[in-house]
């Protein structure tokens, strides 16, 4: 349930409903695995998927999108904001292009919903996925917004619940909890966003200015208010996570949904990072409860840990030797 089911439903049920019109779907290389794996599933069943490239900031090219649309294109699915690097895509422009070509537009807004303003009519969004756990709501509950008039097949067959589109007894506690979480998130969004942007930019500035051989991943301004993603050369991100955890700091080296994987992030590879650069990444997520004091603590600990790991790194030692020789 939640965001993954919503993404699956949007793609699979739309593909089935519009298969007579065409079997071509457009998405991006940096989508959540709930989209990418669903696309792989559809490819095995005769659908053709075009995966759009992104630039170094994680943004798609609108010209590439326009060029990818064909007479048999039935759906464009582009995430609103990336869960790893925080980049916010040009959703309104994508929606306008989709509308002009008579193609349905779905956006995975799990990471962006209640973080940034979303207007489904102005942005020409036909379907939108969201999840409660990103709003401090219950886990395992989410929703799929479907514009009136969009044909979509039932995802779970059985009873007539949810307008006969998703059978099964409704999770009433989850639904009520999600509703309460959305109401609260919308109420505090403006003040929360202002606070998070201020703290985010403060911490980004400290890390950039005080740690050499590192950089920010994702767009500097077109990004989620609460997202920070850095790459640090000459270290392994997993080692940094362990040492941060010992200091009581929660972080990740990629998507929380792939925390058990040793493979480099597909998102970081898609924006052009080398494998070793992607392995040295750190993702930090802020909240409404974050403070400037905590940002200072994180900055100081990251500085110490990066230096400690580099002191043990043969790659860093080789780099220093090469600098001396030059």
Tell me what each language-model feature is.
Residues 1-326:
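Pyridoxal 5′-phosphate
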């Amino acid at each position: 349930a939640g965001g993954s089911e919503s993404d699956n439903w949007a793609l699979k049920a739309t593909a089935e409903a519009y298969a007579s019109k065409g079997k071509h779907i457009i998405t991006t290389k940096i989508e959540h695995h709930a989209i990418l794996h669903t696309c792989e599933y559809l490819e095995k069943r005769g659908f053709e998927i075009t995966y759009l490239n992104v630039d170094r900031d994680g943004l798609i090219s609108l010209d590439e999108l326009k060029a990818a649309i064909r007479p048999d294109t039935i759906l464009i699915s582009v995430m609103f904001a990336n869960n790893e690097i925080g980049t916010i895509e040009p959703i309104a422009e994508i929606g306008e292009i989709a509308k002009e070509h008579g193609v349905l537009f779905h956006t995975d807004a799990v990471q962006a919903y209640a973080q940034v303003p979303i207007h489904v009519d102005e942005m020409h969004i036909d379907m939108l996925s969201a999840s409660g756990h990103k709003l401090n709501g219950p886990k395992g509950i989410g929703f799929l917004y479907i514009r009136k008039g969009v044909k979509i097949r039932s995802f779970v067959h059985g009873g007539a619940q949810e307008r006969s589109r998703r059978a099964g007894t409704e999770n009433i506690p989850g639904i009520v909890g999600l509703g309460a979480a959305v109401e609260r998130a919308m109420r505090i969004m403006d003040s929360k966003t202002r606070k998070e942007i201020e703290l985010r930019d403060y911490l980004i500035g400290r890390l950039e200015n005080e740690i050499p051989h590192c950089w920010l991943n994702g767009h500097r301004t077109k990004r989620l208010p609460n997202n920070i993603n850095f790459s640090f050369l000459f270290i392994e991100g997993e080692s940094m996570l362990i040492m941060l955890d010992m200091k009581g700091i929660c972080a990740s080296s990629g998507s929380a949904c792939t925390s058990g994987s040793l493979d480099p992030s597909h998102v970081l590879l898609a924006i052009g990072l080398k494998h070793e650069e992607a392995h040295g990444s750190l993702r930090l997520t802020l909240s409404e409860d974050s403070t400037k004091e905590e940002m200072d603590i994180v900055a100081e600990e990251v500085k110490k840990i990066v230096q400690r790991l580099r002191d043990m790194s043969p790659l860093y030692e080789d780099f220093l030797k090469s600098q001396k020789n030059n």
